[in-house]
A protein has these predicted regions:
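Conserved, mostly hydrophobic/aromatic
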Residues: 47, 72, 92, 103, ...
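Expand to "…catalyze enediolate/carbanion chemistry for C-C bond making/breaking, isomerization
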Residues: 4, 8, 96, 125, ...
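Catalytic cores of alpha/beta
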Residues: 32-44, 93-111
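Active-site catalytic pocket residues across diverse enzymes, especially alpha/beta-hydrolases
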Residues: 76, 80, 121, 135
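Glycine-rich phosphate-binding active-site loops on the catalytic face of alpha/beta enzymes
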Residues: 4-6, 48-59, 106-127
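Short, hydrophobic-biased amphipathic alpha-helical segments
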Residues: 99, 124-131
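Conserved anion-binding
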Residues: 1-88
Length: 137
């Protein structure tokens, strides 16, 4: 998984990885336009939408990424429906019990949880169970 902005020839990188039978993915920061990923979506195994500015744990969730997630979900579903790659949609940043259902409803396949597991509200396993339950309802 690489940030689109970090690689000069991102489509070339993805092509090279796919030609080597290596799974590939891209990261979209909160301010990265979703359109940057759409031309290569069918070549990606994973798209990770950052819901915080990367680099520091414990940041607040940025709900404005909803539109980006919903656009990607729609495009991925159409791609799969047309026999294309089964790209996974992932979100990372500020995922906690109170917003886990929200991002699940947006259509993410995977939510990365960090600081939502480690807090004074419960043990790691209790917090994980709470977040998992919220995403499944």
């Amino acid at each position: 998984i690489a940030h689109i902005e970090a690689v000069e020839d991102f489509p070339g990188l993805i092509s090279s990885l796919n030609n080597s039978s290596i799974l590939s993915g891209c990261v979209l920061n909160p301010d990265t336009p979703v359109e940057d990923a759409l031309p290569i979506l069918n070549d990606l195994d994973l798209v990770l939408v950052m819901s915080v500015v990367p680099g520091k744990g414990g940041q607040s969730f940025i709900p404005e990424v909803e539109e980006k997630v919903r656009i990607l979900r729609k495009e991925i579903d159409m791609q799969i429906g047309n026999g294309g790659r089964k790209t996974k949609l992932m979100i990372d940043g500020g995922i906690k019990n109170h917003n886990a259902k929200l991002v699940a409803d947006w259509g993410v396949d995977i939510a990365v949880v960090g600081s939502g597991l480690i807090n004074n509200k419960g043990t790691i396993s209790e917090n994980l169970e709470s977040i998992t339950s919220a995403m499944e309802t």
